[in-house]
Amino acid sequence: MSLQTVVEDIRDEARARAQEISDAADERAEEIIADAEADADQIREEREAEVERTIEQEREQRLSSAKLEAKQARLNARRDILEDVHGDVEDALAALEGDRREELTRALLDAAVDEFDDSDELSVYGRASDQSLLEDVLDDYDGATYAGERDCLGGVVVESNESRVRVNNTFDSILEDVWEDNLKAISDRLFEDQ
């Protein structure tokens, strides 16, 4: 074997080894690229899913916020209507006249007087425009006198001079008691179709 042949064999082996290394490097590079592309695809899919979740959350939040706003607007409208109805009832009570006003005033006065002893001297207060009515009605009660006006829709406030008891039987106080006790029923009736 000549030196030339040995050199050629070494070169061939070196070339083969270099080709082997190059092929292995190319294969490894392709694996790395494939892994990187797979990772990139996975990252992109995760980001897309995250963006979709974020968009869905924002959509749900906005929808929830819009529903809450609409509900609040409905509640405000209902409250306004209830306040209007309450105001209308107050106006109707303030506008009562004649026998109906006298009948209600007598009933409220009777109920108030029943809270006191028969021997008590009673001071009766009422609406300024009801003074004449109250003085006429009080003629039927011993120990009860008209004592002045109260800012109210009608009815009476009765106090005893002997005790520190005060009975508020004004139209206002009765309306507030009835209103509070029946607010749900009133609301249900007004808004039964909604």
Curated annotation (Swiss-Prot):
<dbReference type="GO" id="GO:0005524">
    <property type="term" value="F:ATP binding"/>
</dbReference>
<dbReference type="GO" id="GO:0033178">
    <property type="term" value="C:proton-transporting two-sector ATPase complex, catalytic domain"/>
</dbReference>
<keyword id="KW-1003">Cell membrane</keyword>
<feature type="region of interest" description="Disordered">
    <location>
        <begin position="35"/>
        <end position="56"/>
    </location>
</feature>
<keyword id="KW-0375">Hydrogen ion transport</keyword>
<comment type="function">
    <text>Component of the A-type ATP synthase that produces ATP from ADP in the presence of a proton gradient across the membrane.</text>
</comment>
<feature type="compositionally biased region" description="Basic and acidic residues">
    <location>
        <begin position="41"/>
        <end position="56"/>
    </location>
</feature>
<protein>
    <recommendedName>
        <fullName>A-type ATP synthase subunit E</fullName>
    </recommendedName>
</protein>
<dbReference type="InterPro" id="IPR038495">
    <property type="entry name" value="ATPase_E_C"/>
</dbReference>
<keyword id="KW-0066">ATP synthesis</keyword>
<dbReference type="GO" id="GO:0046933">
    <property type="term" value="F:proton-transporting ATP synthase activity, rotational mechanism"/>
</dbReference>
<dbReference type="GO" id="GO:0042777">
    <property type="term" value="P:proton motive force-driven plasma membrane ATP synthesis"/>
</dbReference>
<keyword id="KW-0472">Membrane</keyword>
<dbReference type="InterPro" id="IPR002842">
    <property type="entry name" value="ATPase_V1_Esu"/>
</dbReference>
<dbReference type="GO" id="GO:0005886">
    <property type="term" value="C:plasma membrane"/>
</dbReference>
<dbReference type="GO" id="GO:0046961">
    <property type="term" value="F:proton-transporting ATPase activity, rotational mechanism"/>
</dbReference>
<keyword id="KW-0813">Transport</keyword>
<dbReference type="Pfam" id="PF01991">
    <property type="entry name" value="vATP-synt_E"/>
</dbReference>
<comment type="subunit">
    <text>Has multiple subunits with at least A(3), B(3), C, D, E, F, H, I and proteolipid K(x).</text>
</comment>
<comment type="similarity">
    <text>Belongs to the V-ATPase E subunit family.</text>
</comment>
<keyword id="KW-0406">Ion transport</keyword>
